[in-house]
C-alpha cells in the first residue's frame, strides 16, 4: 500500500499514528509502558516528514521530535522542568541517533523492495512510509518485556527478538532485510540492552517525575444497548470516559463467561481529552437479551462493574412520556372548555368591558 502524490497525506499520517499508538497496545491492569513511535516518508516534500518521533508514558504524550528541527520538545507539564537534566539530555541524544538510523534503515528496506528513491524525469515518484514502534513494559510483579517492530507502507514488516538477537519477517518481502540485519550482531546486542535495561530504567525515572499525574485513574461508566439490523439482533456494551487505556470487557450468559470465539473483539479508541471509550458487541437471539451481562474491569474500579440491557425500564420511560403528554393535553382541553363556558355565560363581557366587533 504505497502513497501517491495526489493523496491527502497529512490526514493519513495522523490516522496511522493513531492506529499505531492505540490499537496494538492493550496492557494488563497496573502495568506501565514507555513507547516511542517513529514515522517518515521517502518523499517528505509531499507533506509527510522524513522523520517524526513521539514518546508516550502510559499512553500520555511527553516528548516529540522531527528531522527538520532536530530538537526534542517537551509535551507534558511534568517534564517541562527537566529539559536541562541529564535524563532529557540522554533522551535528546537518543532521538537524534534514532533519526539517523531510521533514515538508513528506510533506504535499506526500500532497496530490498527495489523501490528506488531516485525520481525519473517526467515521472511522479511514489512516497513510501516506514513506521517503527519500540519500547518496554514494567509489569505488576516488576518483570519487564520489550518490543521493537517495523511497518512498511502500512503493513507489518519486521520484529526484533531480544532472546535470539534475530529479526522475524512478517512478510516475504522483508526476508532480504531480515537476513542482512541478522548479521549485525553488535547492533542486535545494543537493541537488546536498550529494551531490557535502559528502557525500563528510563520508564521508572519518568514515572517518578510524573507521579500524581501519570497515576491518575478515571473510572468508567458502562451501559448496554440493543440494536436491530438485517443480520439480526445485537447487544452493545459501551465503556465511557476512562483512563488509563487498559480495560477488560467480557460478556456473561446466565452469569457464565462466554467463549472468546463467540464474541467480537473489544475496541478501544481515544476521546481526544486523554480519556478512552471502548465497546463490545454480541449477536443474540431475539428474546434472549436479558440473559446477557457485560462485565468490565478497570484500574479505576474497586471491583468489576456489570451492566445489562433493561427493556422494562425503557418501556416504562416511553409509557411515562406518553401518559404525561396525554394528561397535559386533557388538562389544557379542560381549561379551554371552562374559559369558553364562562365567556358564554357572561354574555360576552370580561372584567366589566363589553366586547364588540371592530367596524
UniProtKB/Swiss-Prot annotation:
SUPFAM superfamilies: Immunoglobulin, MHC antigen-recognition domain. InterPro entries: Ig-like_dom, Ig-like_dom_sf, Ig-like_fold, Ig/MHC_CS, Ig_C1-set, MHC_class-I_related, MHC_I-like_Ag-recog, MHC_I-like_Ag-recog_sf. The keyword Transport applies. The keyword Disulfide bond applies. Residues 218-309 are annotated as: Alpha-3. Residues 340-359 are cytoplasmic. SMART domains: IGc1 (SM00407). Residues 25-318 are extracellular. Keywords: Cell membrane, Disulfide bond, Glycoprotein, Ion transport, Iron, Iron transport, Membrane, Signal, Transmembrane, Transmembrane helix, Transport. Binds to transferrin receptor (TFR) and reduces its affinity for iron-loaded transferrin. This is Hereditary hemochromatosis protein homolog. The chain crosses the membrane at residues 319-339. Glycans are attached at residues 114, 142, 166, 246. Residues 219-308 form the Ig-like C1-type domain. GO terms for biological process: BMP signaling pathway; cellular response to iron ion; hormone biosynthetic process; intracellular iron ion homeostasis; iron ion transport; multicellular organismal-level iron ion homeostasis; negative regulation of antigen processing and presentation of endogenous peptide antigen via MHC class I; negative regulation of CD8-positive, alpha-beta T cell activation. One of its GO terms (molecular function) is transferrin receptor binding. Residues 127-217 are annotated as: Alpha-2. It is found in: Cell membrane. Disulfide bonds join 136-199, 237-294. The lineage of its organism: Eukaryota, Metazoa, Chordata, Craniata, Vertebrata. Residues 1-24 form the signal peptide. Its main location: membrane. Residues 310-318 are annotated as: Connecting peptide. Belongs to the MHC class I family. Residues 25-126 are annotated as: Alpha-1. GO terms for cellular component: apical part of cell; basal part of cell; early endosome; external side of plasma membrane; extracellular space; HFE-transferrin receptor complex; nucleoplasm; perinuclear region of cytoplasm.
Amino acid at each position: 500500500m504505497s502513497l501517491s502524490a495526489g493523496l491527502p497525506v497529512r490526514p493519513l499520517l495522523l490516522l496511522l499514528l493513531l492506529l499505531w499508538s492505540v490499537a496494538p497496545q492493550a496492557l494488563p491492569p497496573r502495568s506501565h509502558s514507555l513507547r516511542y513511535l517513529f514515522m517518515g516518508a521517502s518523499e517528505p516534500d509531499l507533506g509527510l516528514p522524513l522523520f517524526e518521533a513521539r514518546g508516550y508514558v502510559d499512553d500520555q504524550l511527553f516528548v516529540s521530535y522531527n528531522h527538520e528541527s532536530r530538537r526534542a520538545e517537551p509535551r507534558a507539564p511534568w517534564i517541562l522542568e527537566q529539559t536541562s537534566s541529564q535524563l532529557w539530555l540522554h533522551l535528546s541524544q537518543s532521538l537524534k541517533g534514532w533519526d539517523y538510523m531510521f533514515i538508513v534503515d528506510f533506504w535499506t528496506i526500500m532497496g530490498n523492495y527495489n523501490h528506488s528513491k531516485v525520481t525519473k524525469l517526467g515521472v511522479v515518484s511514489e512516497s513510501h512510509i516506514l513506521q517503527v514502534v519500540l519500547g518496554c513494559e514494567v509489569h505488576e510483579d516488576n518483570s519487564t518485556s520489550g518490543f521493537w517492530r517495523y511497518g512498511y507502507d502500512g503493513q507489518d514488516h519486521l520484529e526484533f527478538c531480544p532472546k535470539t538477537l534475530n529479526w522475524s519477517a512478517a512478510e516475504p518481502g522483508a526476508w532480504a532485510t531480515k537476513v542482512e540485519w541478522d548479521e549485525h550482531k553488535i547492533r542486535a546486542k545494543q537493541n537488546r540492552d536498550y529494551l531490557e535495561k535502559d528502557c525500563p530504567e528510563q520508564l521508572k525515572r519518568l514515572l517518578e517525575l510524573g507521579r500524581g499525574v501519570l497515576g491518575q485513574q478515571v473510572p468508567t461508566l458502562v451501559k448496554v444497548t440493543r440494536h436491530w439490523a438485517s443480520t439480526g439482533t445485537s447487544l452493545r456494551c459501551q465503556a465511557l470516559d476512562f483512563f488509563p487505556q487498559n480495560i477488560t470487557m467480557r460478556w456473561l450468559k446466565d452469569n457464565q463467561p462466554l467463549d472468546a470465539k463467540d464474541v467480537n473483539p473489544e475496541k478501544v479508541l481515544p476521546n481526544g481529552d486523554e480519556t478512552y471509550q471502548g465497546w463490545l458487541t454480541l449477536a443474540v437471539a431475539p428474546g434472549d437479551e436479558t440473559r446477557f451481562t457485560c462485565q468490565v474491569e478497570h484500574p479505576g474500579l474497586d471491583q468489576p462493574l456489570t451492566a445489562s440491557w433493561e427493556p422494562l425500564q425503557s418501556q416504562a420511560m416511553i409509557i411515562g412520556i406518553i401518559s404525561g403528554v396525554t394528561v397535559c393535553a386533557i388538562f389544557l382541553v379542560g381549561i379551554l372548555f371552562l374559559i369558553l363556558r364562562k365567556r358564554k355565560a357572561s354574555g360576552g363581557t370580561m372584567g366589566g368591558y363589553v366586547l364588540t366587533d371592530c367596524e
